[in-house]
A protein has these predicted regions:
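Long amphipathic alpha-helical segments
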Residues: 1-76
């Protein structure tokens, strides 16, 4: 996995919205495949889901993660 891919995963999973959106935009602008970016988002969402199940995240974090995914999806 490339460094920027891991950074995107971490930004989404850690609720760093501005960073996640900027990384996704940069990856797309650099020619990364939109489906790859969305696949990374899906992987990050799995982490968010696990953190929710473990009680680390609550409903507001799920909503924020969904909003990030939607905004990145609109870019792709």
């Amino acid at each position: 996995m490339k460094e920027n891919e891991q950074r995107l995963l971490d930004a989404i999973a850690d609720m760093r919205e501005d960073e996640a959106l900027a990384l996704a935009r940069a990856m797309l602008d650099a020619g990364d495949a939109p489906l790859r970016v969305l696949e990374l988002c899906r992987t990050a969402m799995e982490t968010v889901g696990k953190r929710f199940q473990e009680g680390e995240y609550f409903l507001p974090e799920l909503i924020l993660a969904g909003e990030m995914l939607e905004r990145i999806g609109d870019m792709a």
